[in-house]
A protein has these predicted regions:
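Single conserved hydrophobic/aromatic residue that forms the stacking wall/gate
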Residues: 1-6
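Generic detector of short, aliphatic-rich beta-strand segments that form the cores of beta-sheets
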Residues: 7-8, 225
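N-terminal glycine-rich anion-binding loops that anchor highly charged ligand groups
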Residues: 10-17
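Active-site-adjacent loop and "lid" segments of alpha/beta metabolic enzymes
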Residues: 20-46, 50-53, 57-59, 66-69, ...
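Acidic/histidine-rich, metal-coordinating catalytic segments
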Residues: 146
Length: 233
């Protein structure tokens, strides 16, 4: 789920049909669409008014979702780099677009972690990418720094410490740290036992200015946001 921190607590459901984990099996566009269609349809049956984001980098899948279900948030792990045509689809339908920072592809990204300064390079990337996307007609931008995508453990924490620099660009920032390896490797545990670390890093993301948290444990995240809002009204 996606839990927002701006003004009020807003829940969204993120639906994807393509795993971005390193080593995950390749999925054809048709199979991805089949999975996404089933997922979005299920959400719409259960909660017709709940905002939905669709996790895809493929223009074809994004277009079919928008044609079938109407407006959704498009959540693209490649910020339009893997399938540039997705940018035109987003602009045509004028829907919110989550652009994530990643080098390479999910299959190659872990070998592309050489940065002079990870914070500076991610911020510079989004500063330039924002101009490019806006020129293409994308108006409703959300940035995701891509924790765990083409970053080492140390770089993830460097990026978290400097997250306020990305937030200062003036666009909403989505932070996805839930159950990530940057938590469970430090704690020497497993993803399903990383809730306490997830809450701790989620709080820090909020403190740095993140507008949205991408989470697995929705109620715990909502509680974290509510306490944060009480602490910093």
């Amino acid at each position: 789920g996606l839990v927002g921190s701006e003004r009020c607590i807003r829940d969204r459901c993120d639906v994807g049909g393509f795993s971005s984990r390193p080593g995950a099996a390749e999925v054809t566009p048709e199979e991805e669409w089949r999975r996404v269609e089933a997922g979005v349809a299920a959400v719409r049956r259960i909660a017709p008014t709940l905002p939905v984001s669709v996790d895809t980098f493929r223009a074809e899948v994004a277009r079919r979702v928008l044609e079938t279900f109407g407006p959704v948030i498009v959540n693209d792990i490649s910020a339009g780099e893997m399938d540039p045509a997705i940018v035109d689809v987003v602009a045509e339908y004028d829907v919110p677009y989550i652009a994530m920072h990643m080098r390479g592809t999910p299959a190659t990204m872990q070998g592309m972690t050489s940065y002079r300064d990870v914070v500076e390079e991610v911020v510079s990337y989004f500063r330039l990418r924002a101009e490019q996307l806006r020129r293409c007609g994308v108006r409703r931008l959300i940035f995701d720094p891509g924790f765990g995508f083409a970053k080492t453990l140390e770089q993830n924490y460097d990026l978290l410490r400097g997250l306020h620099n990305l937030c200062s660009l003036g666009y909403p920032v989505l932070a996805g740290v839930s159950r990530k390896s940057m938590i469970y490797k430090v704690l020497d545990t497993t993803p399903d036992r990383a809730l306490a670390g997830t809450i701790a890093l989620g709080w820090e993301c909020l403190r740095q200015g993140a507008a949205i948290l991408r989470v697995h444990d929705v109620q715990e995240a909502v509680d974290t946001v509510r306490i944060f809002k009480a602490f910093r009204p």
